[in-house]
Design a protein with these regions (language model features):
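Cell-envelope and extracellular/periplasmic
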Residues: 19, 24, 79-82, 115
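Extracellular/periplasmic catalytic domains that process cell-envelope and extracellular macromolecules
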Residues: 7-8, 68-71, 103
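Short glycine-enriched nucleophile-adjacent loop
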Residues: 1-9, 14
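Glycine-rich, phosphate-binding/catalytic loops in enzymes
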Residues: 8, 31-33, 93-97
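C-terminal catalytic histidine-bearing segment of alpha/beta-hydrolase fold enzymes
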Residues: 76-78, 85, 90-137
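Hydrophobic beta-strand segments of well-ordered beta-sheets in folded domains
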Residues: 13-15, 73-76
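Mobile cap/lid helix-loop segments that gate and shape the active-site cleft of serine hydrolases
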Residues: 19, 24-67
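Surface-exposed acidic, glycine-flexible loop patches that form ligand/cofactor-binding
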Residues: 65-70, 136
Length: 137
């Protein structure tokens, strides 16, 4: 949510912990195939747009992968590298897209080896980087 809003509004800085959902096509397709439990988000998208197979573009338009440029404010991303596979599936692609962004403000990545989904709140390294980011903005 914070990352998406950063393409719309300027602030004194944005912090995104384990940003997502990065790829709703992938996530909702797993749900449709019964590989993971259904979520309210994918169920609602399916009711509005049909399946990921019949209308993948609608799902992609809502995915964070579609919002990897145009950041109006500096942003700190914190991602635990032991997060769920569904989160990490698109993380390298998202990170690369943000790193090559030519119309973004400054982006900083903190990847926590061994960290899980809540790394911003559980990792001393992430907390330190969080505090440094806050103080600089």
């Amino acid at each position: 949510m914070a990352t998406r809003l950063n393409t719309m509004h300027q602030t004194n800085g944005v912090i995104a912990n384990a940003p997502g959902p990065l790829n709703l096509v992938y996530r909702c397709q797993l749900e449709e195939n019964g590989q993971i439990q259904s979520s309210a988000v994918c169920t609602k998208l399916k009711n509005v747009y049909g399946t990921t197979t019949s209308n993948p573009n609608a799902y992609f338009q809502k995915s964070l992968l579609n919002f990897s440029n145009g950041f109006k404010s500096d942003i700190l991303f914190v991602q635990g590298l032991n997060d769920a596979p569904i989160q990490l599936y698109s993380w390298p692609t998202f990170k690369k897209e943000v790193e090559i962004c030519t119309n973004c403000q400054n982006s900083q990545f903190v990847e926590i080896v061994g960290g899980e989904h809540g790394s911003l709140f559980e990792s001393s390294t992430a907390k330190t980087e969080f505090n440094k980011f806050i103080k600089s903005h």
